[in-house]
Swiss-Prot record:
It is found in: Secreted. The keyword Aminoacyl-tRNA synthetase does not apply. The lineage of its organism: Eukaryota, Metazoa, Ecdysozoa, Arthropoda, Chelicerata. Keywords: Disulfide bond, Ion channel impairing toxin, Knottin, Neurotoxin, Potassium channel impairing toxin, Secreted, Toxin, Voltage-gated potassium channel impairing toxin. It comes from the Eukaryota. The presence of a 'disulfide through disulfide knot' structurally defines this protein as a knottin. Has the CSalpha/beta fold, which comprises one or two short alpha helices connected to anti-parallel beta-sheets stabilized by three or four disulfide bonds. This is Potassium channel toxin gamma-KTx 4.12.
Amino acid sequence: ERDSCVEKSKCGKYGYYGQCDECCKKAGDRAGTCVYYKCKCNP
């Protein structure tokens, strides 16, 4: 589930992006951030 967030979530140019954050939360993580245009989940 978490891996699909990285693939599916579009990341903007800077910082947080809602889609990534939401996806990570659904995957059971605390939050999601964008790092180098990729979604990363924070446990």
